């Protein structure tokens, strides 16, 4: 590791194979916590390259516990995290909204590393038992239209670095990797990122894959569509900037999206959204993220039509019914 760190300190970049080997060594416990933290710190000081990101991703996918749910052609909706905003669980709520609209979802999530509550915290608050049983996940897809994959069960490297990430409490390149290594390798993905260089990096990375995707970024730094500012959406062949007002929404304040101080606070906000009793800001932010996810799967629909489908899922109670059925099936 010493030679690797010296190389990085001299502002050199890792090759794809080199990055792959480093991640494999981390997963196998060949480096101590201080060495891993030093490596992580380098990538806090500069942007990661496409080659480095692809190499890290190669290692994680090679070591993953594979899950074949390809018959469902599902979508994952995920943010990188690490934007420092402590929002409520927007992408998780959007997942159940999309599933309620009839589109299969495989949510790949983890505990919060830089926020109060990650997707796995919300699931635990609802009594969900995490599993790597593929048959159980297939039943969940068949009966609920959604399955949840707790990342550490499927990737030893993510589990190995979890205490270090929690101790640092800042975004790391593992925030960037999490969305790229859903063990299902979903057919579709909506990914939120916290800055424009990362939006371009993910767009280049996804263009090398078979995944149909959209990468979103709010220009004031959110790793999802926040409706607090203009936002950019990048797909395989297009980039476009939208305004909240142009899509019929108000422009909200940062405080409108606050996730609370505890996992219990975050779970309460999540429940309010599912019960259609949330604030206008909370509801509409979930709707707009769900809408762009729906459009990834159904590109023939206009974004206005997708917004209507997302609203209907929440307002009709179908998103809530999906959540209740999911909890019932997955808390045993």
From Swiss-Prot:
Residues that coordinate or bind 5-phospho-alpha-D-ribose 1-diphosphate: 79, 82-83, 87, 89-92, 107-115, 119
InterPro entries in alphabetical order: Anthranilate_Pribosyl_Tfrase, Glycosyl_Trfase_fam3, Glycosyl_Trfase_fam3_N_dom, Glycosyl_Trfase_fam3_N_dom_sf, Nuc_phospho_transferase
Superkingdom of origin organism: Bacteria
Requisite cofactors: Mg(2+)
The keyword Transferase is assigned to this record: yes
SUPFAM superfamilies: Nucleoside phosphorylase/phosphoribosyltransferase catalytic domain, Nucleoside phosphorylase/phosphoribosyltransferase N-terminal domain
Record field: catalytic activity: N-(5-phospho-beta-D-ribosyl)anthranilate + diphosphate = 5-phospho-alpha-D-ribose 1-diphosphate + anthranilate
Free-text cofactor note: Binds 2 magnesium ions per monomer.
The protein's annotated pathway: Amino-acid biosynthesis; L-tryptophan biosynthesis; L-tryptophan from chorismate: step 2/5
Binding site for anthranilate 1: 79, 110
Record text on subunit structure and interactions: Homodimer.
Name used for this protein in its record: Anthranilate phosphoribosyltransferase
Organism, scientific name: Bacteroides thetaiotaomicron (strain ATCC 29148 / DSM 2079 / JCM 5827 / CCUG 10774 / NCTC 10582 / VPI-5482 / E50)
The encoding gene: trpD
């Amino acid at each position: 590791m010493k030679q690797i760190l010296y190389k990085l300190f001299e502002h050199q970049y890792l090759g794809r194979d080199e990055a792959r080997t480093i991640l494999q060594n981390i997963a196998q416990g060949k480096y101590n916590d201080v060495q891993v933290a030093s490596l992580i710190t380098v990538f806090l000081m500069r942007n990661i390259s496409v080659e480095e990101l692809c190499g890290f991703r190669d290692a994680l996918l090679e070591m993953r516990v594979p899950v074949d749910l390809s018959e469902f052609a599902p979508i994952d909706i995920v943010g990188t995290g690490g934007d420092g905003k402590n929002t409520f669980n927007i992408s998780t709520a959007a997942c159940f909204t999309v599933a309620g609209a009839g589109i299969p979802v495989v949510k790949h999530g983890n505990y919060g590393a830089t926020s109060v509550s990650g997707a796995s915290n919300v699931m635990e608050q609802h009594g969900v038992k995490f599993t790597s049983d593929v048959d159980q996940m297939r039943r969940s897809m068949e009966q609920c239209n959604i399955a949840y994959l707790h990342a550490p069960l499927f990737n030893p490297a993510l589990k190995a670095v979890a205490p270090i990430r929690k101790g640092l409490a800042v975004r790391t390149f593992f925030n960037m990797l999490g969305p790229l290594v859903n063990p299902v390798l979903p057919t579709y993905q909506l990914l939120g990122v916290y800055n424009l260089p990362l939006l371009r990096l993910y767009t280049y990375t996804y263009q090398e894959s078979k995944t149909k995707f959209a990468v979103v970024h709010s220009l004031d730094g959110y790793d999802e569509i926040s409706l607090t500012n203009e936002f950019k959406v990048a797909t395989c062949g297009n980039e476009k900037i939208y305004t909240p007002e142009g899509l019929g929404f108000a422009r909200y304040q940062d405080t409108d999206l606050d996730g609370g101080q505890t996992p219990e606070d975050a779970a309460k906000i999540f429940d309010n959204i599912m019960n259609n009793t949330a604030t206008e800001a909370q509801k509409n932010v979930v709707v707009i993220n769900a809408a762009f996810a729906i459009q990834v799967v159904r590109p023939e629909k206009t974004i206005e039509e997708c917004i209507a489908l997302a609203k209907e899922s929440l307002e009709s109670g179908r998103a809530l019914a999906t959540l209740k059925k999911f909890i019932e099936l997955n808390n045993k």
